[in-house]
């Protein structure tokens, strides 16, 4: 069977359809600009960024034990006045990726929008750099300084001298200065309690965070929203927070966790007194 040959007019029409369309000047300009942008986003997505990923960490009851040894031990002639406290004083932490760990843009974006995770600037968590040994040494040095300040602040608050009360502090696997306030509260609870034969907590689980100076001033710390989640997870109903960080704490405040702002050790003790006695308690 013979088939007719395609006409020249049909071929010309097909050729016209098959010829690529020419891009306009505007389209070519957009294409030229888009190529480096796409390449830039591709590089950014896989390049390591100076962030760490953090989540709620452990809590530790400073009135209890850490690895089978008391966190706080007191002795001396002025150390036997306190009664037993059946509540808890929980210091709180965050858990972060180690210094120098590779963190990429997709991880930062994902953690930025989660309420139970956070992406934080690396320098805010590891101010001395990304060498693990240096970071660990720095954190342990800060912990020792914090403990020394906590002892001085507690003794000053109780008007006792180191000759009257000898204090030993031990908290395994935790570094940094943010447990200072709770070390001081724990020392006072173990030495004099509430001054009426009871403990400071009134049987509650009280959590919190904050640095401490020898004069009793409470300072801000990092990661408060994550620490409030750790506190709620471990049974706390009250969270003592440095007043300067009330706004941060309220952003992701867990339901049922009462935020109590503090500026000094004396103020923290007054707030705990008010909680026990049903008095007026400050609030964020």
Question: Which ranges hold each PLM region?
Answer:
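Peripheral, non-AAA+ core regions of ATP-driven protein-machinery
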Residues: 2-284
């Amino acid at each position: 069977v013979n088939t007719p040959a395609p006409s020249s007019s049909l071929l010309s029409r097909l050729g016209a359809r098959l010829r690529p369309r020419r891009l306009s000047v505007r389209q070519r300009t957009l294409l030229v600009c888009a190529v480096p942008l796409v390449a830039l986003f591709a590089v950014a997505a896989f390049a390591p960024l100076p962030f760490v990923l953090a989540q709620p960490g452990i809590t530790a009851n400073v009135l209890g034990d850490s690895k089978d040894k008391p966190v706080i031990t007191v002795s001396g002639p002025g150390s036997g006045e306190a009664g037993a406290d059946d509540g808890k004083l929980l210091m709180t932490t965050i858990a972060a990726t180690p210094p120098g760990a590779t963190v990429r843009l997709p991880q930062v974006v994902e953690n930025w929008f989660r309420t139970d995770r956070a992406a934080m600037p690396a320098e805010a968590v590891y101010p001395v750099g990304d060498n693990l040994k240096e970071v660990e040494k720095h954190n342990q040095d800060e912990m020792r300084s914090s403990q020394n300040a906590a002892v001085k602040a507690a003794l000053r608050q109780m008007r006792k001298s180191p000759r009257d009360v000898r204090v030993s502090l031990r908290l395994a696997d935790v570094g940094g200065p943010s447990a200072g306030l709770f070390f001081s509260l724990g020392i006072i609870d173990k030495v004099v309690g509430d001054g009426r034969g009871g403990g400071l907590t009134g049987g509650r689980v009280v959590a919190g965070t904050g640095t401490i100076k020898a004069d009793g001033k409470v300072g801000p710390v990092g990661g408060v929203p994550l620490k409030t989640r750790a506190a709620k997870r471990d049974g706390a109903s009250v969270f003592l927070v440095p007043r300067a960080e009330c706004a941060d704490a309220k952003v992701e405040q867990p339901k049922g966790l009462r935020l109590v702002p503090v500026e000094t050790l004396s103020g923290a003790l007054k707030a705990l007194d008010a909680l026990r006695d049903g008095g007026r308690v400050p609030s964020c």
